[in-house]
Amino acid sequence: MEILMASSNLIKQLQERGLVAQVTDEDALAERLAQGPIALYCGFDPTADSLHLGHLVPLLCLKRFQQAGHKPVALVGGATGLIGDPSFKAAERKLNTEETVQEWVAKIRKQVAPFLDFDCGENSAIAANNYDWFGSMNVLTFLRDIGKHFSVNQMINKEAVKQRLNRDDQGISFTEFSYNLLQGYDFACLNKLHGVALQIGGSDQWGNITSGIDLTRRLHQNQVFGLTVPLITKADGTKFGKTEGGAVWLDPKKTSPYKFYQFWINTADADVYRFLKFFTFMDIEEINALEEEDKNSGKAPRAQYVLAEQVTRLVHGEEGLIAAKRITESLFNGSLGELSEADFEQLAQDGVPMIELEKGTDLMQALVDAELQPSRGQARKTIASNAVTINGEKQSDPEYIFNDEDRLFGRYTLLRRGKKNYCLICWK
């Protein structure tokens, strides 16, 4: 695995991985990194109760910088989360209550923590919350000390805002328009508090980052830098990080480790080697060798399994990975003996389609209710043709009624038609 130690080459190494979309004054930043460790930050606004896959690249970028000896600051936006970032958003965000946002702040801080080392000496990570400096600031201070440094002419010409201003059906409120000032002040504040010299974020944050650079120069006469990572796209043009069920979350209660693992297993061949560069710490040579091996093997590529394993371990730890692989193996082989009650809970959460049934239901009706067959008549034929299994065991009796032995842990039965059509029955 690649540990990015040579700070002067760090930007080039990130570029080789495709992880740099834009950077301000690249030569000066490279020179500053060559002089020794810096502090850098990335902000995470609590717009939900969990981070999602879109946050993973900048979060891992913080980790890459820390591995190279720099000091990462993870800023959770307890204040900015109350306002909402308008950047490239088609419509105004819904405002959440202060209580809700503070709950989300606590959850996101907890989620960020395992990715960074908060106890490693001089480059130990710092967790910050911008509510600490905005919560007690009054409007006059905001307008006099921050607002006077921002030109409205420049603000309305920023691409992220311009798109909203040009839409007839959606303008932009003063609340969202002021977001740029808040994020800009975050940079200036962190520069003063912790000597932060670099902000990283998604490429949609470029306008906010450059505002922070300008404000820091005006308030503190310090040169600071910005670097954006690309917004991840898929080769087929569809949005990355979404499934039919919505976003892929980092919280295991919202997206189970099993479903998370499956998301990566289903990565297209056209994307997988690029994603290995974005989402893992494998070195480039190792990834290129794997690509070459897959091309020449004549078999199904191994890259998806490597990617799924690496990223699931990063996000859910060894235990989450082992559970995800165990469930995958059991479903593939139809042998459920290895599954724990917690594994079934993962499947019930979002692993496979699920229905609740009353005890006494027969097999034909279960197949219809589970939408594995359109009618009892069709279900009868399918059962008789030996195409149905209950908990991995074939059942060919159309009149079969489920019994207590079928209810694993007193609650779960896995019904399968053919090789790939599953439904988990949860008994009432």
Curated annotation (Swiss-Prot):
One of its GO terms (cellular component) is cytosol. GO terms for molecular function: ATP binding; RNA binding; tyrosine-tRNA ligase activity. It catalyses: tRNA(Tyr) + L-tyrosine + ATP = L-tyrosyl-tRNA(Tyr) + AMP + diphosphate + H(+). It is found in: Cytoplasm. A motif ('KMSKS' region) lies at residues 239-243. Keywords: Aminoacyl-tRNA synthetase, ATP-binding, Cytoplasm, Ligase, Nucleotide-binding, Protein biosynthesis, RNA-binding. ATP binds at K242. Catalyzes the attachment of tyrosine to tRNA(Tyr) in a two-step reaction: tyrosine is first activated by ATP to form Tyr-AMP and then transferred to the acceptor end of tRNA(Tyr). Belongs to the class-I aminoacyl-tRNA synthetase family. TyrS type 1 subfamily. This is Tyrosine--tRNA ligase. The lineage of its organism: Bacteria, Pseudomonadati, Pseudomonadota, Gammaproteobacteria, Enterobacterales. The gene is tyrS.
